[in-house]
């Protein structure tokens, strides 16, 4: 067979033309040690801080320690089958979670994967869990209220949209109950809610989800779960994931409320990771950046102005401000608010609601201590009605506590002191409230008016509770339209004052309480 050199060269040219090199540069490394969910990797010269590292078995780790000759990373999920010598790869991606309206009514894990058995989630895209908080120029002052439905909170420590209000207290003082009631009260307010459960028992979380469903609040709530059985990495990242889901609504000119339950457990998870990564421990064995852990999270809760929203949505939403309100929860040990993490979070937030064990055990629930509970910015967000009528409540309670301490030692008291003590007792009784019974603005206003205008003076302390419940039932039955309008407007003027007095007079005359 005669080979023609021209044909051969043509054939070679054709082959060369068809030759296609598809090569992809990948940074790979090798696991050198595995211990308690933390892996050390040799190689990965191009890895970024916080980057996702692909592991065998469709799992990921997050790079946290970038050292001279190795990388320390935390595994997202089970790690028992990882071993030395396994190959890992850089992904070039930062951890992202699904965001959007499709998440409302769903229970998801830290990675945004559904765990409620209701099928796939129809999300609107993905968002990185670590985002820089809006700057000063993009923010607007807090001047709209978030009604929790609790008399003690809405009257004395009001919360505004875009505020960070800490709920702090020992275990079993009603911290979660307060936060869950605040979520339930947003059923008809248009505020979307995110509940982040960190390091809690699965049975407790399922109970919370059931209660939200029973009260019709789950449909506008996202529940993010990193239970006690999850790895420390997932517990540490859960609040950031929940925050990214809340920012979706904030940046589109809507209002959202996020509850972190609780950040003490997140700090403990972060401490565990840091110690395993051999970072130097500081006070209470926490790492040096534990303040930054919480500050970068809570600074993302803000009220953003209309320009920011318009810019973010490329002009699709105009003239609307957005907000993300945060209710972080911190658990104290034996009422010690001067411990490391509590003082950090108190200094970051715009006020705190302090729940006291002695109040709770005495039957004062919610167990809010009005003496050291404050709201630094919420006052400007209070409705006119509550602002005008709640002024005397805090003063009455402060005077009552002071006098009650002295009254223990005094044998005879003058009439003025006796009157103040009696009024203080009645106000304390009035502020008691059962769980899952949030109050409307009008109901709150009417209760406060009864205390402010002296209608409780001739009511015995034991009868204050029944007096109030009968008064509210009477008002809802006979003045339904007025109560509805008042809840909507939250206004206060001479006409409204006269109407409230008319309701109280009429009730006192006609009703057997």
UniProtKB/Swiss-Prot annotation:
Its main location: membrane. Signal peptide: none annotated. Keywords: ATP synthesis, ATP-binding, Cell inner membrane, Cell membrane, CF(1), Hydrogen ion transport, Ion transport, Membrane, Nucleotide-binding, Translocase, Transport. PROSITE patterns: ATPASE_ALPHA_BETA. It is a peripheral membrane protein. Its EC number is 7.1.2.2. The keyword Lipid biosynthesis does not apply. GO terms for molecular function: ADP binding; ATP binding; proton-transporting ATP synthase activity, rotational mechanism. The record marks 373 as: Required for activity. It is found in: Cell inner membrane. ATP binds at residues 169-176. It catalyses: ATP + H2O + 4 H(+)(in) = ADP + phosphate + 5 H(+)(out). GO terms for cellular component: plasma membrane; proton-transporting ATP synthase complex. Belongs to the ATPase alpha/beta chains family. Produces ATP from ADP in the presence of a proton gradient across the membrane. The alpha chain is a regulatory subunit. F-type ATPases have 2 components, CF(1) - the catalytic core - and CF(0) - the membrane proton channel. CF(1) has five subunits: alpha(3), beta(3), gamma(1), delta(1), epsilon(1). CF(0) has three main subunits: a(1), b(2) and c(9-12). The alpha and beta chains form an alternating ring which encloses part of the gamma chain. CF(1) is attached to CF(0) by a central stalk formed by the gamma and epsilon chains, while a peripheral stalk is formed by the delta and b chains. This is ATP synthase subunit alpha. It comes from Glaesserella parasuis serovar 5 (strain SH0165).
């Amino acid at each position: 067979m005669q080979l023609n050199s021209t044909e051969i060269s043509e054939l070679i040219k054709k082959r060369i033309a068809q030759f296609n090199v598809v090569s992809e540069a990948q940074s790979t490394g090798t696991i050198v040690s595995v211990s308690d969910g933390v892996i050390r990797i040799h190689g990965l010269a191009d890895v970024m801080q916080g980057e996702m590292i692909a592991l065998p078995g469709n799992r990921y780790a997050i790079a946290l320690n970038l050292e001279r000759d190795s990388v320390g990373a935390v595994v997202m999920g089970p790690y028992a089958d990882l071993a030395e010598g396994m190959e890992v790869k850089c992904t070039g991606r930062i951890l992202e979670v699904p965001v959007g309206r499709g998440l409302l009514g769903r229970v998801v894990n830290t990675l945004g994967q559904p765990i409620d058995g209701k099928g796939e989630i129809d999300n609107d895209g993905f968002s990185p869990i670590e985002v820089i908080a809006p700057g000063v120029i993009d923010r607007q002052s807090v001047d709209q209220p978030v009604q929790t439905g609790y008399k003690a909170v809405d009257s004395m420590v009001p919360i505004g949209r875009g505020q960070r209000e800490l709920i702090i207290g020992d275990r079993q003082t009603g911290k979660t109950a307060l936060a869950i009631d605040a979520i339930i009260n947003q059923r008809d307010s248009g505020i979307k809610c995110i509940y982040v459960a960190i390091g809690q028992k699965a049975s407790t979380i399922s109970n919370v989800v059931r209660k939200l469903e029973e009260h019709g609040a789950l449909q506008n709530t996202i529940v993010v779960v990193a239970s006690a059985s999850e790895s420390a990495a997932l517990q540490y990242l859960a609040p950031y994931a929940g925050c990214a889901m809340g920012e979706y609504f904030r940046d589109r000119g809507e209002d959202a409320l996020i509850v972190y339950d609780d950040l003490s457990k997140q700090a403990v998870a972060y401490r565990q990771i840091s110690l395993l990564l051999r970072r130097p421990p500081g006070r209470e064995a926490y790492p040096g950046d534990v303040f930054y852990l919480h500050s970068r999270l809570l600074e993302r809760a803000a009220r953003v102005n209309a320009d920011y929203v318009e810019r973010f949505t490329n002009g699709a939403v105009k003239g609307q401000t957005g907000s993300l309100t945060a209710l972080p929860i911190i658990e104290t040990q034996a009422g010690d608010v001067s411990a490391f993490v509590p003082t950090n979070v108190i200094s970051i937030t715009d006020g705190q609601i302090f729940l006291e064990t002695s109040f709770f055990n005495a039957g004062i629930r919610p167990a809010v201590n009005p003496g050291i509970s404050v709201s630094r910015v919420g006052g400007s967000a209070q409705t006119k009605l509550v602002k005008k009528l709640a002024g005397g409540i805090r003063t009455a309670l402060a005077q009552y506590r002071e006098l009650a301490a002295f009254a223990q030692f005094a044998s005879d008291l003058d009439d003025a002191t006796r009157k103040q003590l009696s009024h203080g007792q009645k106000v304390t009784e009035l502020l008691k409230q059962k769980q899952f019974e949030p109050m409307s603005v009008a109901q709150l206003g009417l209760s406060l008016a009864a205390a402010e205008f002296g209608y409780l003076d001739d009511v015995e302390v034991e009868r204050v509770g029944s007096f109030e419940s009968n008064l509210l039932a009477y008002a809802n039955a006979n003045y339904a339209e007025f109560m509805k309008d008042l809840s909507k407007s939250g206004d206060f003027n001479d006409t409204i004052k006269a109407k409230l007095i008319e309701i109280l007079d009429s009730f006192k005359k006609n009703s057997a309480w």
